[in-house]
From Swiss-Prot:
Family annotation (PROSITE patterns): MPN
GO molecular function terms attached to this record: ubiquitin binding; ubiquitin protein ligase binding
Bilayer topology: Peripheral membrane protein
Protein's name according to its UniProt entry: Nuclear protein localization protein 4
Stretches with biased composition (Low complexity): 644-655
Length: 693
């Protein structure tokens, strides 16, 4: 016989036999109450067939001496358990009461094997110590600010002096709907949304700590069931452990409000790869977070560089390694370069030449087609799940993500535009639960059909119809992809001040296009050093101009990461290298370059450059002899013919120099176009100029 028991702790199912005694039946009912919940007072326990006072209530002690069979229950009956929580014993655990101002959750009772406390109720999250959560600096900054929107005195409505204030000029809250509408702000900033959630709470320090305002969405079945009244899913499921239905709406806030690219060369680097190969490219954005003043309590991401992972580009897509094997190393190097620098997002190309004019790009992402496809949205959500935001405003210690996605695609004028977005928090939950999948139509998302051992909750989406009424529609089998993301604005600074000044070094993981190697490092560094007569191996003799050129050459993200990953520098020297590469952005760090020049890794690099330059000098003839071998006067000795500039005489001579006699049938090299003339004339067969110069 199956009986359902509904209590303040939830609904549970019990399987009993007609011969089960009343004492065993009462104990089974008590076992459905999780130990983490307030325990009932035995004197107040009562069982009823109707909720509240509407039905007949039977106290628990009346069950003694009886069996379930003679209580009149039928299979599937719903019974209601009522009780009052047991009052805490003031004499018990005095030390706990003295140090803990708030009640602590009860610990699991080992005598009850069916008691589970993770979590105690459906859609709740276990409490954890949030004091150890390290929040980003930008979040710490906005938490200390009032966020009020200052307004000036309104000359039309204000009837007071300059030092007074009224309803027409008092500061507004950062979530003020009228201000949001007047300034066409579609999404609240993250911290403005938090202020809105906390506005109804008392302004105490403990209210935000004890009751975090954000609750991460969970669409997975809770296993094991908190009640412990049935086997774990898929063998059993109840209203306590199954996820609730979800209604999708446009997310009212966004975690990032703006993306700022520090330099146009960041975008140009990706475009140049596409122009040269015709295949798509993807890269991860390296940047930091900062305040954004154009929206109340706004946050922007400043992109300083990109890192291209191992990938195989195609004409209409690409294949990229997952997971990204070098991410932890890149994160470490970025942190050394600048405080707060990390992986903040990804960017990829979706460019197709126009069939009518190959100099223009095809405009395929617009209001009549789609902005982001369902496959792209699932990819964005997956990367956001792997880069959660640490915050004390969520009971789990993290909420959503600030990982952004950018796409380079064609615009209506045939140029290239940037589209930027983030997957919503609901999209992350749906991807994590595995209840959605991509569709052939890029503008819609499919809700998966549950397979064996799977559970997919009901999904709806809400919108306003043509009459302005809010309508709820089932999302199965498909729903628009717009419900799963929020748009983000982007731009470039008016006065660029990038962290990395150079981009001369080749980009990583571009086989066949250009490769990174130590030979490229040696060649580029030697080209800088050879412009001075100073000794290559002694950086102390370099003039200031050379040091400035080397410092600018080092300020290249791709060069820094390459040198750090080659093993030429020790761990400490790698940190010095990163400091030297960004020293121009930190005026107080004046000794980074000198420390690098004095390091062992740098001396080893200079030794290699010096030996390479010496080897090239021995293998290549001097410029003067090279010109003489061609029968041409060296530009360094231009002018009247002298003894030192005369061509070598003897049988090994190749030809006559400029100024030799015009007669004879020997080969003569034209001093203007270097063509070898075999006739005995005085003019060149190719350019027609005189062979005598």
């Amino acid at each position: 016989m199956l009986l359902r028991i509904r209590s303040p702790a939830g609904t549970a199912r019990l399987t009993v036999q007609p011969e089960t005694t009343g004492e065993d039946f009462a104990e089974a009912i008590l076992n459905t109450i999780p130990a983490a919940d307030p325990q009932p007072d035995p004197a107040t326990l009562a069982l009823s067939n109707q909720p509240g006072a509407a039905g007949e209530s039977v106290p628990f002690h009346a069950l003694s001496g009886r069996t379930v069979g003679d209580m009149g229950f039928s299979h599937g009956d719903l019974l209601f358990l009522s009780y009052k929580p047991r009052a805490a014993d003031p004499d018990s655990h005095p030390a706990m009461q003295a140090t803990a101002p708030h009640p602590q959750p009860a610990q699991p009772d080992p005598s009850h094997p069916k008691t589970h406390t993770d979590p105690p109720m459906p859609n709740t999250i276990p409490l954890r110590d949030l004091s150890s959560v390290q929040e980003p600096e930008i979040d710490q900054y906005w938490e200390k600010q009032t966020g009020k929107i200052e307004r000036k005195r309104d000359p039309a409505f204000c009837r007071h002096g300059d030092k007074a204030m009224c309803d027409y000029c008092m500061p507004l809250e950062p979530y003020d709907p009228k201000f949001q509408s007047e300034h066409q702000i579609k999404h609240l900033s993250y911290h403005a949304y938090l202020r809105k959630l906390l506005s109804s709470r008392p302004p105490t320090a403990s209210s935000a700590t004890d009751l975090p305002p954000l609750s991460p969405t969970s669409l997975s079945v809770i296993t094991p069931c908190p009640t412990g009244a049935h086997p774990s899913f898929p063998d059993g499921i109840c209203s306590t452990c199954q996820p609730s239905a979800v209604t999708l709406q446009s997310q009212p806030f966004r975690m990032v409000d703006h993306i700022e690219f520090a330099s146009p060369s960041i975008i140009e680097g990706l475009l140049s790869a596409w122009r040269r190969t015709g295949t798509q490219r993807i890269a991860f954005l390296i940047g930091r977070e900062d305040k954004y003043e154009k929206v109340p309590m706004g946050i922007k991401v400043i992109v300083e560089a990109v890192w291209e992972p191992k990938q195989e580009g195609e004409l209409d897509g690409l294949t990229v390694e997952t997971p990204w094997s070098d991410e932890s190393r890149v994160q470490e190097i970025a942190k050394w370069c600048d405080k707060g620098l990390s992986v903040v997002g990804m960017i990829y190309t979706d460019l197709t030449p126009s069939p009518d004019d190959i100099t223009k790009t095809l405009y395929k992402r617009h209001a009549q087609s789609y902005t982001a496809s369902s496959l792209e949205m699932l990819l964005s959500a997956a990367y956001q799940l792997s880069h959660p935001l640490s915050t004390r405003m969520s009971p789990t210690g993290h909420y959503s993500s600030r990982f952004v996605t950018c796409c380079l695609t064609g615009d209506k004028d045939g140029g290239v535009d940037i589209l930027a977005w983030q997957a919503s928090e609901h999209a992350e939950a749906m991807v994590k639960a595995g209840i959605v999948e991509a569709s052939v139509d890029p503008a819609v998302v499919r809700v998966r059909k549950p397979g064996e051992g799977e559970y997919v909750p009901e999904v709806f989406y809400s919108y306003k119809n043509e009459y302005g009424l809010q309508v709820k529609m089932p999302a199965k089998p498909t729903f628009p992809v717009e419900y799963l993301y929020v748009n983000i604005t982007h731009g470039f600074p008016l006065a660029p001040s990038p962290l990395f000044l150079s981009n001369a070094f080749p980009t990583e993981n571009r086989p066949g296009l250009h490769d990174q190697s130590m030979q490229v490092v040696i060649t580029q560094l030697a080209a800088i050093l050879k412009t001075s007569d100073a000794e290559i191996g002694d950086a102390g003799t370099w003039p200031g101009r050379i040091k400035k050129d080397v410092e600018k050459w080092l300020s290249d993200w791709h060069l820094v990461t390459f040198l750090c990953m080659q093993g030429l520098f020790s761990l400490k020297e790698q940190q010095i290298l990163c400091r030297a590469a960004t020293a121009h952005a930190h005026p107080n760090d004046t000794h980074a370059l000198e420390e690098l020049f004095a390091s062992g890794g740098w001396q080893t690099l200079l030794t290699i450059v010096d030996s390479e330059a010496s080897a090239n000098a021995r293998s290549n003839p001097p410029p003067t002899s090279s010109f003489n071998n061609l029968g041409i006067d060296s530009p360094a000795f231009a002018g009247p013919s002298t003894e030192s500039s005369a061509p070598p005489s003897g049988p090994d001579s190749v030809g006559a120099g400029a100024g030799a006699g015009a007669g004879g049938g020997r080969e003569r090299v034209c001093p203007h176009c270097t063509f070898v003339n075999e006739h005995g004339g005085s003019d060149c067969e190719i350019c027609g100029l005189p062979l005598d110069g």
